[in-house]
Every structure is written in structure tokens, then in C-alpha cells.
């Protein structure tokens, strides 16, 4: 602020400095950062976060700082757009002080130099580059900093440099060279005695002169050179004040000041400092010149071409920028919660470009020219090869470590990410960039952040972090001695804690199990490498012995940690966790060694063979052969080989296949002693007859391996007698010959029948076994079955003559006695196709079947297998004699609804069915039947039938009813009922389960909907309409009729709805009768009626309102003699559709009868589809259609209620499965015009889709739903349109959808009757009746004339037919009363076999034609 003012400044405030801060609005004092005599610097808080407030206390209260403040504000405006500058955001004065306010950053360069992790070489270069670039940017704006020092160079958490505390306008440009107090007063605020000022700044003449002097850019260059030198001197200042004066006078040179280490390690750096620290300002290079001169020489090209600009983009992304001529912007942390996620997504999407710019070798996923045996890391759309760093490109990338700049940003900002999916992407990026840094950097800079991610709340993040930790550790080739015990002291304890805390997260435990072996192998390599390095550097023998003892201690601790983790995983209750460990267990066995593997691993693996899950047994068998080779022949013979042979009898055939395959591999390695070949052959040879071809082929190939390792004499003396019965004739023992000459296997039915016989046999000799103490070579007890001799000796049959037909003769001339039950089973085999000569095959398979059955019964049932496989039952529990108990439900209504129909409604025995379940036997029912209704004046007390356990529905009290407004009380008050079950048992679990079932009556049992009608009135044959006017009715209520519906119930009704909410119901019989006039029923709704839909078979219908309501009405009839008259319109249900959008309302309703249910499908104006149960008016399903396809305006449900079709304004037709609410297909055609109407037409027992819209040249198109192809087109003219207009175009393949091509609010009216389409054009004048079967019979009504048209039918393709319209002649009809106004609705009905047509026009008239 000038020398004159500053010399008068108070050296200490008269009151506490905090009092100057607290008087500011929304600012709270925190602490004082320095106690400079010139400017007091404090940290404070405001709504935007932490701020720094610099306070200048005025020497006099009348002192004005206005001119200085104006200069500071102009400077701040210039600097506000630079991302590497932190300008003052608030500059103002009070009567006592001047204030400078800026954002607070925690770290400056001076503090960062003493903080771990220290800068690497590439980071130091990038910081220097940023400093020069920032200085260039401010100098380009003609802004001078004036006081560059390490305290004013701020750094973010990821080392982005920011210049702050510009002081060229508040501190003197020159100070006296004979007054050190001036230097301390202005520039030595930190009291470090370090001097960063340029030598020329010390000029007594200019400092004491009256002229205005400004600081120069060269001064900033010198100051920045001192900061750069300090950066390489590990925080030691280059000059103090006395040294600077000596340097200025020439007593010191730069070579004397710079240490020799800098000159030797980086001679280029010395050149840079010389160009910046010249005593003569004119010899100093500018920031721009320095950047250009040392490009490639010192700074990599990547800094210039990509890295700096990309980092600057990351800094500015999602941040707020002040408006023009503003120096501040108000923003809070809440405003930037998602900004880091946006930056992360950008880096992830730009990964390929980043790697290309940083010259990191990556592969595209489409590139198939890589070795598939290599491991790859997939990030975004790129692949990184793992464990293959031999190429020069990869080595250069690692040595350069340029990827560390992006890596540091990702690591520092990982904790600020909000969404788990973005954290997963960040972990992938961290791992990818870590592949291109040095090993020490991997362990010191990356690993801590990956390990910290193991404590994240998201399971996905934990799993990805565990995989990334393992991959990163595997990529480390040369660890240093500091990281020797990283597994014991750091990594494994955290993995152990993750395993213990993740008991409910099976995916986390799976990730640990799958990576444990790799970690164990790498931990062993770490120790071996570090021991080797240590032994070569320690010559002291005593110290060597001490080191060996420490090494052994850590080795034992490391092994114990891995042992604990392994046991926890091996005993985990989840099968998937065990399987994950088995897939990669060999490295873990190698780490433990033979003894530990036997004790820790093998003892647990043996128990897996008794597990119910076949996948676990199969994976165990696949890995057991490798473990056998690792553990040696003794373990192989004593433990593993017997287990393998035992598992051949597994009940799961895939497990058996896996066993045989691994046994063959073991034989091929000659790891099995020949003394076991006989027992193996004897055990396997019956499986040649097994119906599974895989088992059969693997058995034969296994036998070939045994034969190949034996001499010919051994084969014929030992194996030949065992194998001969299973081959048709003597053959050479080769694989091809054995397979081609083996006996045919038994069929699958025969094999299943044999197993069933074994399981169900009771009185049998065939399956009777003889007790023996003999065991085979594998320790398995042999199975001996009874024979004829044994039966005679032990069953008293020595002297008895036994019939020969109760013996089974085998190929070995062995007679097997049979009981009558056995004889019955043998007859079954013969009936299944097994001949007498083939019965020996079931004898050969008998032992294997018994062993496999015993193996199945030995496996205990686990909780997992009980839940996942309910069909498996424990062997000690039998349901063979337990009969199923079928439970029936019965629904009984408590009382009829307030509105009953006995007296009011007309009953016709031919057309109405009453539900039998609505009858009652108590006294109340008699009163109800006599009087018609029973109204309780006071509510009844809720009752629960506690004495009957099979009646469990609470009886709710009825509401008070008003006799005068009975129709209002009926709304949303369905009849109360109880549900009875036929279960009379005492099992609490079954009772609880039955109570949880949602049992509702069928719709026909709800009396408020009226009686079920069997009205089978046929649809009108509109082709017989002649256009003769019958009569006309004026609309007696306000509004224009917009909606209409014909309802076929006990009678035929015509329902109209207006835009004013007027709902009218007409009796069609009286409406078409010229001799009688009837007054319609009227109901005034609260808003415009948007849609009407009748409930087929009921005197009820649905109405949709623009006020978001859906109302269900019942038409009540009265009886006047034999006549049935309209009496009342009753609202029985209502529902408000308002959800997230208050302006949502229904635009179309479809009915979906589903067995005893009746569901409503409602389409809203927000393209949402709701499925309601009409009985409860509850939402069953909500479907949000694809907004990219445009607003949905039409809908239709097929006749079988299986398919839903939707049409949009952009011409898209969506086909959905109505049962599962899954989209099947979305397509468009033609010009993609709006789909105004969709309908279903039955033709030749096939459902066709009628589409009105999509193409302008046709009235409508017919589509084959099965083939999804256009079948028939009714063209508006006699010109054939292009075939391309009717090709199916997949909606997802469209680049841009056509929205609002047809802006007309007037839509054509389309009605479907049998095979005819009634089409009213969009101007409401011409009415077309188009016959899809006989196009020549189509006609058009227009005023008093009937235009007859013929259609020429063209078979364009094998599947497409076009009907081209041709105008023939006009026929005059006495039709003077034909409406001249625009037609609003068209309906057709049939009365006494005569068709009628009702037209409503915009003037409100209902016109009837025949």
C-alpha cells in the first residue's frame, strides 16, 4: 500500500485481531496464521467454507484506501479466469481496516517439501512446469506478483500448483539496501530469514524517490528461480539476506551456491537456474522462453501436448466461474458433491486418449492379434496386458512414470466419490495407471489407497479393491527392504479383518478366497528377494545371525496369518467361497509345503467329498491330482488315490466324469504304482456298460493308459480275465479297438430301473450281501452277494429241490437265487427291452449301483442344500408313505353390501348367474333376503374367530351408511369376508404359511359389480349399413362429447363422456326405437373425461378423468312389469392416479380378464402403464415405457391377454409380454408418423395387429404378429407406395427419432368390427367402411351421398398384399338429415339383427343411422 502508509502502520493491534474478523457478516474467526506487522493473516469460516482474511489496520480512521482497492479489484478480475491462480475474492475497507479475502488452501510448497510421500522426479518436473506456466499466464495479462516464495505457492491434494497473495499493488516495488528492517517488515513474514527477492529490488534511490515505480517481470523470474532451487534442495533456501547481497556484489557465483549434487544429477536444471537467477535482469529469460528452450531437453513433450491442458480441464470441470467483471462466486460444498464423479467419468471415458497421449501401450478390445494365454486388464474399451513387461515401450513408460500425475489425482480424489459404480471405475483406473510406475511407487503410493477401499460400504467396491490389491502385488517384481514385511504388518491383518467383517457378504469372501493363493505366493517371493538383497549388503556375521532370527520370526508369523485365513475359508458355510479357493489352491499348497498342506488343507478337503453340492465335489476332484503330485507318492497312495476311487461311485455323473478324467491324467504322468492297476481295472470295467457315453469313453481311455504301462504278459495274465467279458471278441488293447469292440451299454431306462430296484427292494436275494472282512487295495470293503450255494447252506434249502426258473444265470455260469419279488423286477427288465442274453449286464453293474447308493446316503444334508434343492431329503427321513394333504379354501361374505339387487335389479335366469358362495345359513341371511338390505346404524366391534384355527381373517366393522346417498358409501368399500381353510392339523408353521396366502374372491362374487351376464349379442355387420337416417337426439348436458363406448351387459348400453365431465348412459333399445323417448342416466364428474372402457359381461364400466381419477360405475336397473328401465348410476370404485407427477392422468384403459381376476391396464399421459386389480384397486405392476421413443398415445391388449402393444407419437410400436412385463420388440416403419390407433383383428384363426398411422399413404396396415411383418395395406389412392415404407426398422437402430411430424390435434376415428374397419377421416366428414376380406365391398358415407369404391388387390410379395382404392360412382340416398358438423364419435351396434350406427357431432347431437 505504499511506503508512506505502511511505515505508519500499527505494529500490533490495540485490540484482539479476532475482533476485526467477527464484525464481518457471516464470517467466524478460527485462528491467526501469522503475526506480520504489515498484514495480519487469519483463517476464518464463511458459508462457502474456509477462507483467509488479510487485515491491514489503518494508522488513522480517516485514511482512505479507495484507489488501492480499485487497482486490486481490476487485478483480481483479470486473474479470476486463470485456474492456476487464487485471486482475492473480496476486497473492501471499513473505518478502521482494509480487508483482503481469498479461499483457504491447506498446503503450500514449503510444507509439501517436508511431507510424505516426497516428490518423484516426474512430479518435481511437473510442478516446475506448472510454476513457469502460471507465471507465463499472469505475465501475459501484464500482472506482476511481486512476492513469489514457497509460502505463496499453494498446492492441492494432488499437487496442482496455485499462485496466491499477489502484492505488487500493496507492497513497495523497491526497498532500501541499507535498511534490513524494511525487508523484514514487508517480505519476511514467516521469520525464516530466507530471501527470494531479486537483487535489483534493493535500491535505496528508487525506494526513497518520489517517483512511481513498479515491480518488473524479471523480479518474478528471479523469485521463482529461488523457489525451484529450494524444491530440488529439499526445502533448504537458496539465499538469505546477506548471501543475496554478496551474490549481488559478485562475491558469490551460482556455482558456489548450488550444491554439487544438483550439478551432477541434473546438469540441465543448473542451466535453467542460471537462466533465471542472473544478476542482470536483462539476461534472465522470460517464462515463455524458458518453456520453449527446455522443451524435450528437460520437460517431456507430453506436458505441452496433453498432460497440462488435460489437468487444467479436470481442475475447471464442475467448478464455478465468476461472471464478467466479478471476482467472486458464491458456492458451497453441497453444490459440488457430484463434481468428482463427473471428473472420474470423464477420465474413464478418455482412458484410451490418455494412454495414447502418454504413450502407454494398450490394446483395443477389437484387436484379436494378441496371445489369449496372457492376462489382461480391461478398462473402458481398452486392454492392458499383465505380467509382460519385456517390451521397450512398457519399460520406457515405467521409467518415465508420467502416468503418476493422473494416478495421484485418482488416489487423492477417490474418497470424495459418491457412487459405488464410479468407485469401481476409479479402482480400475488406479490399477491401470499403476502398471506404468516403478515398484516402489506401486507399494508406497498406490497400495494404501487400494487397501483403504477394502473398508468401503459397498460390496462391489470391496470386491474390486481386493482384486486390484492382488493384481498390483503380483506386478511388483523388485520390492525394497522397507516393504519386506508389508504382508505381516500391513496387508494381511486388513484382509483378515475384511474376512471377519464380511460374514454376510459372500462376494467379498469369494474375492478373498480367489486371491489368497496369489498373495501367498507373492509374499514368499517378497521375502526371498529381500533376503537375497540383504545377504549381499551385510558383512557382519553377528548382525547376520540376528537378522536371520528376525526373518524366521516374521516367516512364522506370516505363515500363521495365511493358515488362519485358509482355515476360515475352507470352513466357510458358502459353497461358492470354497469353490473360489479350490480353483487356485495349488500355489497355496506350494507355499505351505507338504507337511502343512497335509495338516491344514488336505484334512479339510477330504470332508468335501461328503458334501451335498456336486459342484464342490467336482472342483475338488479337478484340483486333487495337482495336489497329489505336489505332496508326493506316499500321500498319493495312502490318501488321495483311495479318495479318487471312492468318488467314482458318486451319484452325480458329472463328478464321475471329472474323477475319471483326472485319474487318466495321473496315470499318464506315471504317478500311480502298477500294483494298483488290477484293482483299478476291476473297479472300472463294469462302467463300460454305463449308459453315460462320457463315463464309458473315459473308462476305456483310462484302461488304455493302464495297459500301455504294462508288459504284454502282465496285461494278458492280470487284466485280460477281468476285461474279456466286456468285449465281443479278443482285440488288440488300443483305444480305438477297445471303443469299437466293447459291449453295448445298457439303456438309460434300464440303468434307472436297476437303481430303483436297489432302493426299493425288501424281500430279495439279488441284492442280499454277505458280510466279509476283506478289503481291496484302496481300503474299501468288498461286496459279496449271495449265491445258490449260500442260500442252500443258510436258508435250509440243502435238501429242497428249487425250481430253475427262480435262478439268474450269468456269463460266469453263476446261479443267482431270486425271490418272487426279484422275479417280478427281472420281468420288468425284459419288458423294457433287455434280452435274456443281456441280463448279465445288470449283474455286472450291481456292485457299482450299490456303492453309488451308499455314497448318496452318506452325504449329510446341509442348510444350503435343503434350501436350494428341496427335492433332496436326508436318508433318515422317508416320505414314501406320507400322503399329500390338499388344502381347500372357502370364502364366505359376512353380509351383503349396503346396495343389494334383489328388488332393484332385474334377474333373468337365462342370462344371469348368481354365485353359490354368496348364500348364508344363519338368521341374518334370512332377514337380508326378505328386506333386500341390512343397514347397521352403529359399527360393530371387530371380531376375530379365535376358536376356529382354520378361520383367520379379521372381521372389520362396516361403516355408517347414509340412506340418502347409498351410492357414495359403496365407493371403495368392498364386501367384508372371511377365508376358511380345510386344514385341521396342529402344525404352527403350516398355519402361519396358510395365513400368509392372499386369498381373494373372484370378481363375480362381488355383488357391487352386478350380476355376470352371458349376453352373446353379435357385433354388427357394418357392411349392411345403408346410411338411412333414423332419428337425432340433442345433448341435454354441457360440453362436447369426446368419448363413447358400447357396453354389452344384461342389456345394451351407450355411454358418452364430455369435456365438461358429463357422463351419460343411454338404453340402446329405447335409443333406436322411434316410438319411445328415454331419458339417459347422468353423472357429473369432477373433470374432463379422457377415456371410457366397459367391463365385459358386467353392467359396469371404467371412466378416466383428467383430474387423475379412475372411477368404476355400475348401471342399476329397475323392474317395471316385464320392462327393464335405467334407474341409477352408482360409483362403486375410485382411485387417484397421482404419483410423482401431479398432472398425470389416464388416456386409455384396457380390460384384462384373467381367470377369476379382472385387471385394468391403464396408460397415462406420462407414458406410464399401471396394472390394477379391480377388486382391490391396488397397483399390481407399474411399467415405465422408454421415453426415448416419444410419448405413448395408443395401446391394445391381444385377445389372449399375452401381448401388449403401444404406439408413440414418433411412430414406434412396442410389443411387450403382458405376463412378465418384458419388452419383446420395438420397431417403426414408413415415415414414422404417430401411431393413432392400435387394434387386434382375428383372421383365419390368427391375431393380426391393425395399425393406424406410421405412414401417410394408407388408411391402415395389418401386421402378422408372429412373423412381425406387414401383411395387408389399404392404400388411400390407386398409386402403389414404395415397398420400403412397410419394412420393419428396429427402433434401437434409429439415429434420430421423428418427433412431432404430425402436429394436428385432430386424430382419425377408427373402430374394428369383425373383419371390417370403420375409419373416419381427421376432418370428420368422410366415413369409410373397409372390408379386409372383400375390399370391393368397401364404401364411404359423405353427406347425402354414398360413394362406392372398389379396391384392386395386388399381391406385391409372397407375404404382402396391397389394396389400392379406386373411385367408381356415387349413389344418392335420402339423407337430408346427415350431420354437416364434424363427427366426434362413431359407434355401431346390432339390434334385432339390424345394424345401427351412432354419430355424435361437435354441436352435441346424437344421430342414428341404419
From Swiss-Prot:
Q: Does the keyword Thylakoid apply?
A: no
Q: Where are the annotated WD repeats, by residue?
A: 1037-1076, 1187-1226, 1230-1273
> Which residues of the sequence carry a binding annotation for ATP?
33-41, 54
**Domain Protein kinase residues, every copy:** 27-299
Q: Which reaction does it catalyse?
A: L-seryl-[protein] + ATP = O-phospho-L-seryl-[protein] + ADP + H(+); L-threonyl-[protein] + ATP = O-phospho-L-threonyl-[protein] + ADP + H(+)
Q: HEAT repeat boundaries? A: 441-478, 485-525, 556-594, 596-633, 635-672
Any one GO CC term of this protein is:
phosphatidylinositol 3-kinase complex, class III, type II
The question of whether Methyltransferase is a record keyword is answered with no
* Pfam families for the chain: Pkinase, VPS15-like_hel
Keyword field:
ATP-binding, Autophagy, Endosome, Golgi apparatus, Kinase, Lipoprotein, Membrane, Nucleotide-binding, Repeat, Serine/threonine-protein kinase, Transferase, WD repeat
> Which Enzyme Commission numbers does its entry carry?
2.7.11.1
Which GO BP annotation is one of this protein's? Answer: cellular response to potassium ion starvation
Write one Gene Ontology MF term.
ubiquitin binding
What SUPFAM superfamilies does the annotation carry? ARM repeat, Protein kinase-like (PK-like), WD40 repeat-like
Give the membrane topology, semicolon-separated if more than one. Lipid-anchor
Where does this protein reside within or beyond the cell? Golgi apparatus, trans-Golgi network membrane; Endosome membrane
Q: Which CDD domains match?
A: STKc_Vps15
- The active site lies at 147 (proton acceptor)
Phenotypic consequence of gene deletion = Leads to large vacuoles and defective respiratory growth. Blocks maturation of the phagosomes and renders cells hyperadherent to epithelial cells and susceptible to the antimicrobial arsenal of primary murine and cultured human macrophages, as well as to thermal, salt, oxidative, genotoxic, cell wall and cell membrane stresses. Displays defects in protein trafficking.
Post-translational modification note: Autophosphorylated.
Subunit architecture: Component of the autophagy-specific VPS34 PI3-kinase complex I composed of VPS15, VPS30, VPS34, ATG14 and ATG38; and of the VPS34 PI3-kinase complex II composed of VPS15, VPS30, VPS34 and VPS38.
**Similarity annotation:** Belongs to the protein kinase superfamily. Ser/Thr protein kinase family.
Task performed by this protein: Serine/threonine-protein kinase that plays a role in signaling in modulation of host immune response, intracellular survival and virulence. Required for impediment of phagosomal maturation in THP-1 macrophages. Regulatory subunit of the autophagy-specific VPS34 PI3-kinase complex I essential to recruit the ATG8-phosphatidylinositol conjugate and the ATG12-ATG5 conjugate to the pre-autophagosomal structure. Within the PS34 PI3-kinase complex I, VPS15-mediated phosphorylation of VPS34 may be required for recruiting VPS34 to the membrane but not for activation of its PI3K activity.
* Name this protein carries in UniProt: non-specific serine/threonine protein kinase
Q: Give the source species.
A: Candida glabrata (strain ATCC 2001 / BCRC 20586 / JCM 3761 / NBRC 0622 / NRRL Y-65 / CBS 138)
